[in-house]
Amino acid sequence: MVKLRLKRCGRKQRAVYRIVAIDVRSRREGRDLRKVGFYDPIKNQSCLNVPAILYFLEKGAQPTGTVRDILKKAEVFK
């Protein structure tokens, strides 16, 4: 099963997260299937590849709670 979840990047005390499609059995920092966006919680900024996100959601991918909140804020779910 595939999930849309956050992958931590950046440096200490300055985290930036990539939103990735990844196998549910993989570690947080494991190999992802595809990068579909990023989220910066400090600047409260996000950039999303909406067609790729919709593709994975149509194929049955489940977003985690935090990713679901980011997608709702960006109005991906209409």
UniProtKB/Swiss-Prot annotation:
Protein localization: Plastid, Chloroplast
Keyword rRNA processing assigned: no
Record keywords: Chloroplast, Plastid, Ribonucleoprotein, Ribosomal protein
InterPro entries cross-referenced by the UniProt entry: Ribosomal_bS16 (IPR000307), Ribosomal_bS16_CS (IPR020592), Ribosomal_bS16_dom_sf (IPR023803)
The protein's name in its UniProt record: Small ribosomal subunit protein bS16c
GO cellular component labels: chloroplast; mitochondrion; small ribosomal subunit
NCBIfam families: S16
UniProt main location, coarse: plastid
GO terms of biological process kind: mitochondrial translation
Family, per entry: Belongs to the bacterial ribosomal protein bS16 family.
GO terms, molecular function: structural constituent of ribosome
